[in-house]
Amino acid sequence: MSLLLQHQFKPLPADKQIDTCSFLDSVSHLPAFFDCLGSAIFSPIKADITGNITKIRSVYESNPTKFKTLQMILEGEKELHGPQWPKVGATLALMWLKRGLKFIQVMLQSIADGERDDQNPNLIKVNITKAYEIALQKYHGWLVQKLFQTALFAAPYKDVFLKALSKGQTVKEEECIEKIRQFLVNYTTTIEAIYIMYNKMNAELDYKA
C-alpha cells in the first residue's frame, strides 16, 4: 500500500490546528489515487483536487507565516475579502478539496469495513457509490451525476484496485486492508477537523457545481 503509506498524514495536535505545509505535502500525492480506479472517467475529480491544491498552495506561499495553518488561511481571507468570503480564494478551494478527500476516505473505509455486493464480491461499485453519495452527489448537478453513474461501469475489480494501490505488487488482500486502516487513522482525523472548522466558521456553501 505504498501509494498511501509513503505519504502518511501527520497526527494533529490537541488544538486540531492543521499545519498548511504538512497538509499540502501529504495531500499533493493523493490525485494519483484516481489513477488506481483505472478509468479516465474519474479524471474530472482528480483534476478538481489537483487544481484546488494548487490554489491553496499559491495562497500559502504568498505568506507562509501568516498562513501557517489552514484555519489561519480562512481567518485571513475572511478579513481580507469581507462579504465575498467564503466564496473566494483558498477558502473556496479547500471547501471543494475536502469533499474530494472525503470521497477517498469514505470509499477506503467502506472497503476496510468489508462492505460489498454479495452477488459480485470482487466489484467495488458499492464502495464508490457510497463515497459519492456521501461526499459529492449533493453538490453536483444532474449532468455530472449522470457522468458519475457512467463511470461506475468502468470501475475496476477490487483485486485490481488493491494491486494498483500497491504500485503493481501482488500482495494479500488482508495485508492491503490493514494498510488502508493504518492510512485512514490520521487521514480521517484531518478530514473531520477541516469539516468541523468550516461549520464553526460558517464557511460551508451548498451550491451545485
From Swiss-Prot:
Residues binding beta-D-galactosyl-(1->4)-beta-D-glucosyl-(1<->1)-N-[(9Z)-octadecenoyl]-sphing-4-enine, per UniProt: D48, I49, T50, G51, N52, I53, T54, K55, H140, Y207
Pfam entry (one): GLTP
Main location as per UniProt: cytoplasm
Key words, A-Z: Cytoplasm, Lipid transport, Repeat, Transport
Annotated stretches, region: 2 X 12 AA approximate tandem repeats: 45-66
Sequence repeats: 45-55, 56-66
Disulfide bonds: none
Signal sequence, start to end: none
UniProt GO BP: ceramide transport; intermembrane lipid transfer
Cell compartments where the protein resides: Cytoplasm
InterPro entries noted in UniProt: GLTP_sf, Glycolipid_transfer_prot_dom
Annotated GO MF terms: ceramide 1-phosphate binding; ceramide 1-phosphate transfer activity
GO cellular component assignments: cytosol; membrane
Keyword Ligase: no
Function: Accelerates the intermembrane transfer of various glycolipids. Catalyzes the transfer of various glycosphingolipids between membranes but does not catalyze the transfer of phospholipids. May be involved in the intracellular translocation of glucosylceramides.
Annotated family: Belongs to the GLTP family.
Protein name: Glycolipid transfer protein A
Taxonomic path: Eukaryota, Metazoa, Chordata, Craniata, Vertebrata
